[in-house]
Amino acid sequence: MAYAQDGNTIRDSLKWAITILKKSEIEFPEIDADTLLIYVLSCDRTRLYTNQDNIIDEADICKYKKLIYKRASHVPLQYITGCVEFMSLDFTVDERVLIPRPETEILVETILDKAQGNILPDKCVIIMEIGTGSGNIAVSLAKNLS
């Protein structure tokens, strides 16, 4: 990225994307615009916000526009980026897998509370999940029960 006063800057790109997403009635246009540009540029939020006047190269602009239009057509953000956070863990998702819902974290926390209260020393807990999908429930339980 180069420095410039105007053109295809981070600031300009975010402003454009937010406008497109608002017109499509996306619930959180600012967050989605930021997240997709972070994804395209492979940077963190701090770098995005502290380099607003940097120019984005043409290939990244094209990729970003495609992703914004995809999101504007209501494709879930997680399917676009291929990633979702669940219980502080990152999981890979695509259209073949349901996106883990925040409410499912309550289910996992409830199972953890019940299992941890019943684990005897030198005993293992066996938990079976059917229809695993992204594996978020089984992996979260395994990580927190080990």
Regions found by a protein language model. Name each.
Residues 62-146:
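SAM-dependent Rossmann-like transferase core, predominantly class I methyltransferases
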Residues 2-81:
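N-terminal auxiliary segments of SAM/dcSAM-dependent transferases
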